């Protein structure tokens, strides 16, 4: 749920019991780490007076060492704080929250269960407004990267743009739209970036996903003589088993703070949003790739309607889901079959889309639906979940009901964990 909340609001938090809660939530924290979501995991830790006493506490595995839990969190968080006294609590907590927001990763904060009841002079002060210093690009590196990229793309005959999932953590979606408007290139997104670029954009050609791309999208991307990928992740899922027909020498890869151009130079300390915004002012307008797409594109036919007593087919179901979508909707797709079916949905302006492609933990969507709906009550959340995944986290439905949420869940019996 904290994962879904962070997707809607920019940061999420969860509070759990020491060890039994911490190790239970570890899987969800790992998922948030993989998706670059700032999430604050707060643990009610042992009484500060129990440290160093060799006592064995409940909710542990019977060891006198209380460091087991923070060690488990080491590889799925960017910072861990164990608060055992009030003297440095302020500094540790501020550092943890700041690091989560700067790194866009989860952090772990364990607070001794006796500390909240102890008075301290700092509690009487007015809280200081929280602020972070903005990150800045190296201006010389930025200028050099933009100049090299503009030269690379302006000499291409049919260049394209492809948006990737790291545009979210880079806060570069608006800059990517600005670049798309300026250059006129055909624009695709990777599957895990669906929802980060407006699908009503005049030059949007769909999802680039190798052999399972949107119709005619792969042909345009893979036949281009230059492509710019903004924030890509090339894992076995997104590359369809590393089968993408791309050539490194044709690619500009833009990561949140680094730009690599073909087989040539790489430019560090260059923020993605600064680079894309500056590049938009340097590119020549070139709609060739989009015009090629427009020539070969054939609209998909609509499936035949089901007879009243006929079994409901998936393609007919998703035609009805498509008709339900509006700018006030958010689609949440579960791992498995729902990924592929939801990728085919055409998102109207303002419609959100979320799924967990990197980590792919079944059952993720139920909790994410709960958290997202709580964070964005003005949105109608539509979740598509397979029955196998639903069994893992179905208990979150009770919390949805308690909170009065108006989520729509399509529970799809697909015959297994697919």
Curated annotation (Swiss-Prot):
Catalytic activity: a 2-oxocarboxylate + H(+) = an aldehyde + CO2
Gene Ontology CC: one annotated term: cytosol
Tissue distribution of the protein: Leaves.
InterPro entries registered for this protein in UniProt: DHS-like_NAD/FAD-binding_dom (IPR029035), PDC/IPDC-like (IPR012110), THDP-binding (IPR029061), Thiamin_PyroP_enz_cen_dom (IPR012000), Thiamin_PyroP_enz_TPP-bd_dom (IPR012001), TPP_enzyme_TPP-bd (IPR011766), TPP_PYR_PDC_IPDC-like (IPR047213)
Protein name per its UniProtKB record: Pyruvate decarboxylase 1
Residues annotated for substrate binding in this entry: 59
Keywords: Decarboxylase, Lyase, Magnesium, Metal-binding, Thiamine pyrophosphate
Binding-site residues, Mg(2+): 387, 414, 416
Induction: Anaerobically.
Thiamine pyrophosphate binding: region residues: 337-418
CDD domains: TPP_PYR_PDC_IPDC_like
Pfam families given in the database record: TPP_enzyme_C (PF02775), TPP_enzyme_M (PF00205), TPP_enzyme_N (PF02776)
Record GO biological process: aromatic amino acid family catabolic process to alcohol via Ehrlich pathway
EC top class, as a word: lyase
Homology family: Belongs to the TPP enzyme family.
Lineage of the species this protein comes from: Eukaryota, Viridiplantae, Streptophyta, Embryophyta, Tracheophyta
Tagged with keyword Secreted: no
EC number, as in UniProt: 4.1.1.1
Gene behind the chain: PDC1
Cofactor binding summary note: Binds 1 metal ion per subunit. Binds 1 thiamine pyrophosphate per subunit.
UniProt cross-references to SUPFAM superfamilies, sorted A to Z: DHS-like NAD/FAD-binding domain, Thiamin diphosphate-binding fold (THDP-binding)
GO MF term list: magnesium ion binding; pyruvate decarboxylase activity; thiamine pyrophosphate binding
Cofactor(s) demanded: a metal cation; thiamine diphosphate
Subunit structure: Homotetramer.
Claim: Magnesium is one of the keywords in the record: yes
């Amino acid at each position: 749920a904290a994962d879904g909340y962070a997707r809607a609001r920019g940061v999420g938090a969860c509070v759990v019991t020491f060890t039994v809660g911490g190790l239970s939530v570890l899987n969800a924290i790992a998922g948030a780490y993989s998706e670059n979501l700032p999430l604050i995991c707060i643990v009610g830790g042992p009484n500060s007076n129990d440290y160093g006493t060799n006592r064995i506490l409940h909710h542990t595995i019977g060891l006198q060492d209380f460091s087991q839990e923070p060690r488990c969190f080491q590889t799925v968080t960017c910072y861990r704080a164990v608060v055992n006294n009030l003297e440095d609590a302020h500094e540790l907590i501020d550092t943890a929250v700041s690091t989560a927001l700067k790194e866009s990763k989860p952090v772990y904060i364990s607070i001794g269960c006796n500390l909240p009841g102890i008075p301290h002079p700092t509690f009487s002060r007015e809280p200081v407004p929280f602020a972070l210093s903005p990150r800045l690009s190296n201006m010389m590196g930025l200028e050099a990267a933009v100049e090299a990229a503009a030269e690379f793309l302006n000499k291409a005959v049919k260049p394209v743009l492809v948006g990737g999932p790291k545009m979210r953590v880079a806060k570069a979606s608006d800059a990517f739209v600005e670049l798309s408007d300026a250059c006129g290139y055909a624009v695709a997104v990777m599957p895990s970036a669906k929802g980060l670029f407006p699908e009503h954009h005049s030059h949007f050609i769909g999802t680039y996903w190798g052999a399972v791309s949107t119709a005619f999208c792969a042909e345009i991307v893979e036949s281009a003589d230059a492509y710019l990928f903004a924030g890509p992740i090339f894992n076995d899922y997104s590359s369809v088993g590393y089968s993408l027909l791309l050539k490194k020498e044709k690619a500009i890869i833009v990561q949140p703070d680094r730009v690599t151009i073909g087989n040539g130079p790489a430019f560090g300390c260059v923020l993605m949003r600064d680079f894309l915004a500056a590049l938009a002012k340097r590119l020549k307008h070139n709609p060739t790739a989009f015009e090629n797409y427009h020539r070969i594109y054939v609209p998909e036919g609509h499936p035949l309607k089901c007879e009243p007593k006929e079994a409901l087919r998936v393609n007919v179901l998703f035609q009805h889901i498509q008709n339900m979508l509006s700018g006030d909707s958010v689609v949440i797709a579960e791992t498995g079959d729902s990924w592929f079916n939801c990728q085919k949905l055409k998102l109207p302006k303002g419609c959100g889309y979320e799924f967990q492609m990197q980590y792919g933990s079944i059952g993720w969507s139920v909790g994410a639906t709960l958290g997202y709906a709580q964070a964005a009550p003005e949105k109608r959340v539509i979740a598509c979940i397979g029955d196998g995944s639903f069994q893992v986290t179905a208990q979150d439905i009770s919390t949805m009901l308690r909170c009065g949420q108006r989520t729509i869940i399509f529970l799809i019996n697909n015959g297994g964990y697919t």
